[in-house]
Amino acid sequence: MSDSRLVKISKYLSKYLRHTPDAIGIKLAPGGWVAVDELITACAKNKFPITRQELEAVVESSEKQRFSFDSTGTLIRANQGHSVEVDLQLEPVVPPDELYHGTGHKSVDSIMETGLCKMSRHHVHLSKDIATAQTVGARHGKPVVFAISAAAMHQAGYIFYCSDNGVWLVDRVPPEYLQKI
């Protein structure tokens, strides 16, 4: 698919996911989300057909990360720049080269096998320094700290957030980006 097609789709999505969703018959849910299937149907009805693959390409190729999918891949939103009322709460940010995760020693084998998963939370929580990760890990017994290759994950398309209190958030950390320290 051509770069010009991706730019055209990106501009179209910007207009309707940021400014005038009602003009194509979509309603943004809290956080600015809309169902991918609903968006694809609305675009087709408005004579601008888009495929799921094109949406994925726009999301993945956008250097400014204008759009993101939720963790299930069933919802999409514009990350910023809205003129309609949307409380996004978090905006994607570029992480430092390394982040850290503290846990108890009982979880190490599982983490090494499957990576870090969000479990019942919305995101995996990461620390910017080893000391904080050790403190977090100590809540679960003898602490173990993992270094996360955050820059490499980001380059691979993983989206990071930083909360107001400095906790770094990501949907998951695959084992290939982890190193026990």
From Swiss-Prot:
Belongs to the KptA/TPT1 family. It is an enzyme of class 2 (transferase). This is Probable RNA 2'-phosphotransferase. It holds the Pfam family PTS_2-RNA. One of its GO terms (molecular function) is tRNA 2'-phosphotransferase activity. The keyword Membrane does not apply. Removes the 2'-phosphate from RNA via an intermediate in which the phosphate is ADP-ribosylated by NAD followed by a presumed transesterification to release the RNA and generate ADP-ribose 1''-2''-cyclic phosphate (APPR>P). May function as an ADP-ribosylase. Its EC number is 2.7.1.-. The gene is kptA. One of its GO terms (biological process) is tRNA splicing, via endonucleolytic cleavage and ligation. The keyword Transcription regulation does not apply. HAMAP family: KptA (MF_00299). InterPro entries: Ptrans_KptA/Tpt1, RNA_2'-PTrans_C, RNA_2'-PTrans_KptA, RNA_2'-PTrans_N. PANTHER family: PUTATIVE PHOSPHOTRANSFERASE (PTHR12684), TRNA 2'-PHOSPHOTRANSFERASE 1 (PTHR12684:SF2). NCBIfam families: PRK00819.1-4. Keywords: NAD, Transferase.
